[in-house]
From Swiss-Prot:
Entry keyword Cell inner membrane: no
GO molecular function, one term: sodium:proton antiporter activity
Keywords: Antiport, Cell membrane, Ion transport, Membrane, Sodium, Sodium transport, Transmembrane, Transmembrane helix, Transport
Known catalytic reactions: Na(+)(in) + 2 H(+)(out) = Na(+)(out) + 2 H(+)(in)
Pfam families for the chain: Na_H_antiport_1
Major location category of this protein: membrane
Transmembrane parts of this sequence: 48-68, 93-113, 129-149, 157-177, 187-207, 215-235, 253-273, 299-319, 326-346, 364-384, 392-412
Upper lineage: Bacteria, Thermotogati, Deinococcota, Deinococci, Deinococcales
Protein name: Na(+)/H(+) antiporter NhaA 1
Membrane topology designation: Multi-pass membrane protein
Amino acid sequence: MTIRRPGGACLFGLLLAVSPTPFPRRTTLTPIRTLLTPFGEFFKGQASSGLVLILAAVLAFAWANSPWRESYFTLRELPLTLSLGSWTLSHGLYWWVNDLLMALFFLLVGLEIKRELRVGELRHPRQASLALFAALGGMLLPAGLYTLVNAGGPGAAGWGVPMATDIAFALGVLALLGDRVSPGLKVLLAALAILDDLGAVLVIALFYTSGLNLLALGLMGAVWALGLGLNAAGVRHLGPYAVLGAALWLTTLASGLHPTVAGVLLALTIPLGRRAEQEDAEPSPLHRLEHGLHPWSAFLILPLFALFNAGVSVAGGSLDRVTLGVVLGLIIGKPLGVVAFAWLAVQLRAASLPEDVTWPGMLGLGLLAGIGFTMALFIGGLAFPEGALLNAAKLGILTASVLAALAAITVLTRAFPRQPR
C-alpha cells in the first residue's frame, strides 16, 4: 500500500508556521514574571506530555507483545510517498516519524536551549555551572559504564544510548509528587535535561553520522547562513523561516547528517527579540514559535514516536550485554554521575546548591535524569539496525526508565516530606 501526498517537506514548514493556540501579541510582565512564566508553562506542558508519553509507550509495548503483534510491525513499515513533480521520497511510517516529525521536536529542543542560554537559568555562568557539571557527569559515567560492559562486543556502538534525559517523562513523574518538590529542584532538572539534550545533539551529529555529501553539506550551510542573515536583518515574521526550515531539512537529509539536526540549526536562526528583563515586551518570534510547537510536540509528535519505537517483543528474549549496559548506565551511572559532579562543582566553589535543594534531593534528581526514554530510543535507532541489538537496547531503556522513575519517587518522597497543613 502506498499513500501519495504532494509537497515534499512542506509539512516541516507548515507545522512550524501554524500555532493551534494563539499567543498574546503583547503582554505587560514584571521582570520576575517574565522569567518565571515561561518556565511555569514549560513545566506544565512537559509534565502533561510525559503522562501522554507513558500511555503511548505502554500501548506500544502491550501491542507488540499481544496476539496482534504482526499488525503493529506492519503499521510501522506502511509506506508513505511524498512527491513533487519527478521528485519522490518514499519510506515507511516509522522513518517519517523518526526523521521528519522528530526534526520538529529537535526544533523545539533547540528553541528551549537558545532561550535558556539567553534569558533563562543558564544565562549566568555561575548559575549554569551546577547544571553543567551535573549534566557532564550524567553523560560521561553512563557512557563509561555501558562501554565497560560492552567493550569489544557487537553492541559497543550503543555507548550514546544511556547519555540523555527525557525531560517530558521526568517532569511527568515529578508532577506526580505535586507541590512537595522544591521549585529549585524543578528548575535545576529542566536546566540539566536541556544541557543533556544539547549533548545528545552533539553526539548524534559527531558520532552517529557517516558518508557525508560535501556538496549537500555546503548547500545546507548556505541555507543556514541565509537564516542567520534574516535574523540579523530583523525579520520577525515566521513565514520565511518556515520555508528555510523545509530547505534545511532536505539539504541536511541529502548531506548524510541525520535530518533532525536541521531542527536545531533552524532554532538558532529564530530571533529572540528584546531582553526578557524589559517590561511591556512583545513576545519574540522564538517565544511565539515555542508556544505554538509545544502542543504539537506534546500530544502528537512524542506520542507517535513512543508508539512507533517502544514496541519491543520480549518473546524468547534473554538478558543481553546491551540491555545490561543500558540499565546500569541509566539507573547507576546517571544518578552517580549527576551527584558526584555536582559535589565536585560545589567543592571547587564553581557552584552552590540552591537554598531549597539538599543532597538527597540531588540524588532524586539524578534518578529522574536516568529516565532516558525518548532520546535513548532515538540514539538506539541510530546506533543499531533493526534486529536483536536494537530490541535489547529498547528493552534496557524501558526497564531502566521504569526502575529509575520508581526509585526517584521513593527518594524524593523522603527528601521532601509533605508538610502538615
